[in-house]
Design a protein with these regions (language model features):
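Glycosyltransferase donor-sugar binding loop
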Residues: 14-22, 167, 194-208
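A conserved, positively charged/aromatic
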Residues: 88-117, 130-132
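Carbohydrate-associated surface elements
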Residues: 122, 143
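Aromatic "clamp/platform" in nucleotide-sugar-dependent glycosyltransferases that forms part
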Residues: 227, 246
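A short, well-ordered alpha-helix in the C-terminal region of glycosyltransferases
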Residues: 299, 306-321, 327-330
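Short hydrophobic beta-strand element within catalytic cores of glycosyltransferases
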Residues: 15-16, 263-266
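Conserved acidic donor-binding segment of nucleotide-sugar-dependent glycosyltransferases
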Residues: 278-279, 283-290, 299-304
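A conserved mid-protein helix/loop that constitutes part of the nucleotide-sugar donor-binding site
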Residues: 1-3, 166-191, 207-208, 291, ...
């Protein structure tokens, strides 16, 4: 929304659905920054829907963009009821929690939706596999605020800590266990590679990872940092970023690691594999394979010159393809085509 405000091409309004975990301080911070926003009730789908309809009739948008499961269902239903001219659905993950009924609702809405956006080619493919219309389903890759990584070139790869970071929330989707087992294998091989885990998430998953680290006797080389207020600084202090995961949409933490000039190593899964060309700008390893991950990390330790070149190429890739202004331009160009189809 801030990017749309900055571009001046559209008048945006951010609508948030209040949930139990919605942090009020973040809402207040957005308002303090001048972000136009409205919070709708989230205690029931009916309450959300009714307030969205009222808001749409008052604001009278030309386009309603509904993000995320299952909010994209209620958002588009409200848009239909309020007579919003154009509806856009944005999908953020390759493996959303669609039940048969929710999928039927989404397909029904898809026939009345102008544009369906996957945040990566992997997500677009997943949408097509679920039966969404190919002629209106596109990929617009996520972008990040690249300016936070401007100092990366002042942190030469060879002068960084020979250590790895995995910046990811603790959740069932992520695979912290495979990285821990890989570190244990490296220890058996006589290779000392410290690893820092940064991120919040579910305490049960975090505690399970910490217990596994203790059982593998890794307390001398594994750090659980929790929430990190300066992820760019953390990444730019390390040589390697790792994303061990089961599936993704478009992993911004990996893009951030690349922008920070780290050598990226990640699981070869949907939403990830399109980011990395092994041997050129990082490495991909089979999902849930501690052996393969340990082998990859060992190659980086033993061949630092090649890893430094890959890290440099990864940074170039992130800067060229994943900036927030580029993502905003792609969305706004798509919106213009909806509003002015004759200009296509």
């Amino acid at each position: 929304v801030e990017a749309h405000l900055a571009s001046g091409r559209f008048e945006p309004l951010l609508v948030l659905r209040r949930k139990r975990q919605t942090p009020q301080d973040r809402v207040d911070a957005l308002r303090a920054r001048g972000v136009p926003l409205h919070v709708v009730p989230g205690w029931s789908h009916a309450a959300t829907l009714w307030e969205l309809v009222r808001l749409c009739r008052r604001f009278r948008p030309d386009i309603l963009v509904a993000h995320g499961f299952s909010d994209h269902i209620w958002g588009r239903l409200a848009g239909l009821l309020a007579g919003v001219p154009h509806l856009v659905h944005v999908e953020h993950n390759s493996r959303e929690r669609y039940t048969r009924w929710r999928l039927a609702q989404s397909r029904w809405l898809a026939a009345r939706t102008d544009l369906i956006v996957g945040c990566s080619e992997g997500v677009r493919s997943a949408l097509l596999d679920r039966g969404f219309p190919a002629d209106r389903t596109v990929a617009i890759p996520n972008g990040i605020r690249l300016e936070r990584f401007d100092p990366a070139d002042r942190h030469p790869w060879a002068e960084r800590r020979q250590a790895a970071v995995m910046a990811a929330r603790f959740a069932r989707q992520k695979d912290h266990a495979t990285l821990l087992h890989a570190v244990a294998l490296l220890k058996q091989r006589g290779i000392h590679l410290p690893v820092t885990f940064a991120g919040g998430g579910k305490s049960s998953h975090r505690e399970a990872a910490m217990a596994l680290a203790r059982s593998l006797d890794l307390e001398d080389r594994v750090t659980f940092l929790g929430h990190c207020p300066d992820v760019p600084g953390l990444l730019m202090d390390h040589r390697i970023c790792v994303l061990s995961t089961h599936y993704e949409g478009m992993p911004l933490s990996l893009v951030e690691g690349m922008a920070a000039g780290c050598m990226p190593v990640a699981s070869d899964v949907v939403g990830v594999r399109e980011l990395i060309s092994p041997g050129l700008d990082g490495d991909l390893v089979p999902e849930s394979s501690p052996q393969a991950l340990a082998d990859s990390l060992q190659r980086i330790v033993e061949h630092p010159e090649a890893a430094a070149r890959a890290a440099q190429q990864a940074r170039r890739h992130a800067l060229e393809r994943h900036g927030l202004p580029l993502m905003t331009q792609r969305y706004e160009d798509a919106f213009e085509r909806l509003l002015h189809p004759a200009a296509r």
